[in-house]
UniProtKB/Swiss-Prot annotation:
Gene3D superfamilies to which the protein is assigned, alphabetical: NADH-ubiquinone/plastoquinone oxidoreductase chain 6, subunit NuoJ
GO cellular component: mitochondrial inner membrane
Lineage of the species this protein comes from: Eukaryota, Metazoa, Chordata, Craniata, Vertebrata
Entry function: Core subunit of the mitochondrial membrane respiratory chain NADH dehydrogenase (Complex I) which catalyzes electron transfer from NADH through the respiratory chain, using ubiquinone as an electron acceptor. Essential for the catalytic activity and assembly of complex I.
Gene symbol of the encoding locus: MT-ND6
Molecular function terms from GO: NADH dehydrogenase (ubiquinone) activity
Localization annotation: Mitochondrion inner membrane
Protein name stated in the entry: NADH-ubiquinone oxidoreductase chain 6
Annotated catalysed reactions: a ubiquinone + NADH + 5 H(+)(in) = a ubiquinol + NAD(+) + 4 H(+)(out)
Length: 175
């Protein structure tokens, strides 16, 4: 099971590398949809089957509508693929090599995978009484996000802030 989740994680990142290398909207939308499906599979394999199903239905359902409209509006006679342009292909390969380097560096044994060590789930007991404790995975995941994962929330907030300016710059009229 661990290998399946690892392969899904690698394909998840490869899909986003494929999207960020700026191919045609047809292939960019396809890579985002595949990455979204793989992300839902990762959530389901981690024990959040209901959350994975809801995200799959809502997120990918909305994405199908948006990308269908985008593809209809931006049809090209000769769509740009990842191998049709040297710049696009090199951006894809550089991103892929960076991911491979990061995986080798993280699994070399010298570094911890997340940057800190979890002693166990005894600190994350949500429902407990006396010596008996019951750990819910989804509640402890939310608690970990706000306690141990504060850097992730700060980075996600910063990325949303920067994406506002990127969207403004892309849609700004040039006279």
């Amino acid at each position: 099971m661990m290998y399946i989740v690892f392969i899904m994680s690698v394909l998840y990142v490869v899909g986003f590398i494929g999207f960020s290398s700026k191919p045609s909207p047809v292939y960019g939308g396809m890579s985002l949809i595949v990455s979204g499906g793989l992300g839902c599979g990762i959530i389901m394999s981690s024990g959040g089957s209901f959350l994975g199903l809801v995200v799959f239905l809502v997120y990918l359902g909305g994405m199908m509508v948006v990308f269908g409209y985008t593809i209809a509006m931006a049809t090209e006679e000769y769509p740009e693929t990842w191998g049709s342009n040297v710049v696009v292909l090199s951006a894809f390969l550089v991103g892929l090599l960076m991911e491979i380097f990061m995986i080798v560096w993280l699994f070399s044994g010298e570094h911890e995978l997340v940057g800190f060590y979890f002693g166990g789930l005894e600190d994350l007991v949500v429902l407990g009484e006396g010596s008996f404790g019951y750990v819910r995975e989804d509640y402890s995941g939310g608690a970990s996000l706000y306690s141990y994962g504060f850097w992730f929330l700060a980075m996600a907030g910063w990325m949303l802030f920067v994406s506002i300016f990127i969207a403004i710059e892309v849609t700004r009229k040039r006279y």
